[in-house]
Swiss-Prot record:
Keywords associated with the record: Cell inner membrane, Cell membrane, Electron transport, Flavoprotein, FMN, Heme, Iron, Membrane, Metal-binding, Transmembrane, Transmembrane helix, Transport
Source organism of the structure: Pseudomonas syringae pv. tomato (strain ATCC BAA-871 / DC3000)
Cited function: Part of the MsrPQ system that repairs oxidized periplasmic proteins containing methionine sulfoxide residues (Met-O), using respiratory chain electrons. Thus protects these proteins from oxidative-stress damage caused by reactive species of oxygen and chlorine generated by the host defense mechanisms. MsrPQ is essential for the maintenance of envelope integrity under bleach stress, rescuing a wide series of structurally unrelated periplasmic proteins from methionine oxidation.
Needed co-factor(s): FMN; heme b
Protein name: Protein-methionine-sulfoxide reductase heme-binding subunit MsrQ
Residues that span the membrane, as ranges: 8-28, 37-57, 75-95, 110-130, 147-167, 169-189
GO molecular function, one term: oxidoreductase activity, acting on diphenols and related substances as donors
Entry-linked Pfam families: Ferric_reduct
Lineage, top ranks: Bacteria, Pseudomonadati, Pseudomonadota, Gammaproteobacteria, Pseudomonadales
Keyword Flavoprotein: yes
Gene Ontology CC, one term: plasma membrane
Membrane topology: Multi-pass membrane protein
Subunit structure: Heterodimer of a catalytic subunit (MsrP) and a heme-binding subunit (MsrQ).
Length: 210
């Protein structure tokens, strides 16, 4: 296994936020409505983790370091873990495990449907993130995993619908998402300079001038 310490560092870093939030809820440090705070925190964490996952390929192209790609699958699975926690908190604290209330919630808050579609997409990606699925699906595997772009759009729409009174934070995440998607356009991706290559070229130029 390549980069074991890097993988471990990413794993521990991804554990910090959920453990901290659950601990805060345990000691009643999340205010009068801890359930709502947990739902919001895990929802936002899912979006942030999705953006971080999508950033791995551009970072690899920019730096030439393969370690970014090595942890991409792990980050994607953490994204799924966060969304599972998000939905678990919603079921526990918002629905109170009253599934009959879900129909009422869907009518009152249709953005839940958008979030549920994003969850199903992440579920499909998580289930097929293994080598067996890659071999089994062949060329269809890449097509399926391009669903991540649709999931990002659904996640941003879900957030937009919730926070439309104050769009500053949403605009930040939407802007980052747009940049990450643009960096995957082949014509743009080919123009991404490698920092290592640029530094090496600069060094050679200095030596030649010297």
């Amino acid at each position: 296994m390549r980069y074991p310490f890097w993988r471990l560092a990413v794993f521990l870093a991804a554990c910090v936020a959920p453990v901290w939030w659950l601990y805060q809820a345990w000691i009643f440090a999340l205010g009068p409505d801890p359930g709502k705070v947990l739902v919001e925190n895990f929802g936002l964490a899912t979006l942030v983790m999705l953006l971080i996952t999508l950033a791995m390929t551009p970072l690899q192209r920019l730096t030439g370091w393969p370690g970014w790609i090595v942890v991409r699958r792990q980050l994607g699975l953490w994204c799924f873990a966060y969304v599972v926690l998000h939905m678990t908190m919603y079921a526990l604290f918002i629905l109170g495990l009253d599934w009959g209330q879900l129909g009422v919630e869907l009518v009152k808050r249709p953005y839940i449907i958008v979030g549920a579609l994003a969850f199903l997409g992440l579920l499909a990606l998580a289930v097929t993130s293994n080598r067996y699925s890659q071999r089994r699906l062949g060329s269809r595997w890449k097509k399926l995993h391009r669903l991540v772009y649709v999931i990002l759009g659904l996640g941003l729409l879900h957030m937009f619908w919730i926070v439309r009174a104050d769009l500053k934070e949403w605009a930040l995440y939407a802007g980052i998402g747009a940049i990450l998607l643009l960096l995957r356009v082949p014509m743009i991706a080919r123009r991404i300079p490698r920092l290592g290559g640029a530094a090496k070229a600069g060094s050679i130029k200095v030596q030649n001038n010297g």
